[in-house]
Amino acid sequence: MNPAERPDTSLCGVRLAIDWGKARIGVAASDRDAILAFPVETVHTADRPVQRLAEIVAEYEPVEVIMGLPVALNGTEQLAAQDVRDAGRQLTEAINPIPVRWVDERMTTRTAARALHEAGRNARKQRGVIDQAAAVAILEHVLEQVRLGQSETATGGADS
């Protein structure tokens, strides 16, 4: 992996994570010290999502935006990956010069749904919450990599 494909572990500051789904987009943010990840909002894909995400980026002023990329268990990109990559390109144009990075989002939605179920919340009635929790899971993984100085799951920039 070339250095341009890795999250910049030297940058302090807020990071945003996006879990782009067919109907909803979960958004999460970190604190400036890259310690905590927390849910921000669920954006509906029918409601001009790139514009709303650009507004969130302007509000949080992140050092980078991390987008989850749908990857199958065998490591190949899922069918939805091209749609997510297209959305990532649009977002990159809207928020330039803030970089957009890709991260393998394997199992994040299932992990989020399971965690909500274990917390006693009905996942079917909380779909927007699941999307936010999936974005939090993506971001927590990246923050752990930043703390460890690693970035094995990054899969390239938005132009990949």
Swiss-Prot record:
InterPro entries reported in the protein's UniProt record: RNaseH-like_sf, YqgF, YqgF/RNaseH-like_dom, YqgF/RNaseH-like_dom_sf
Subcellular location: Cytoplasm
Keyword terms of this UniProt record: Cytoplasm, Hydrolase, Nuclease, Ribosome biogenesis
Entry-linked CDD domains: YqgF
One cellular component term from this protein's GO annotations in UniProt: cytosol
Known EC number: 3.1.-.-
SUPFAM superfamilies: Ribonuclease H-like (SSF53098)
Annotated SMART domains: YqgFc
Domain of life of the source: Bacteria
GO biological process, one term: rRNA 5'-end processing
Keyword Nuclease among UniProt keywords: yes
Gene Ontology molecular function terms on file: nuclease activity
Family recorded in the similarity comment: Belongs to the YqgF nuclease family.
Function as written in the Swiss-Prot or TrEMBL entry: Could be a nuclease involved in processing of the 5'-end of pre-16S rRNA.
NCBIfam families hit by this protein: RNAse_H_YqgF (TIGR00250)
UniProt protein name: Putative pre-16S rRNA nuclease
The organism of origin for this protein: Cutibacterium acnes (strain DSM 16379 / KPA171202)
Native organism taxonomy: Bacteria, Bacillati, Actinomycetota, Actinomycetes, Propionibacteriales
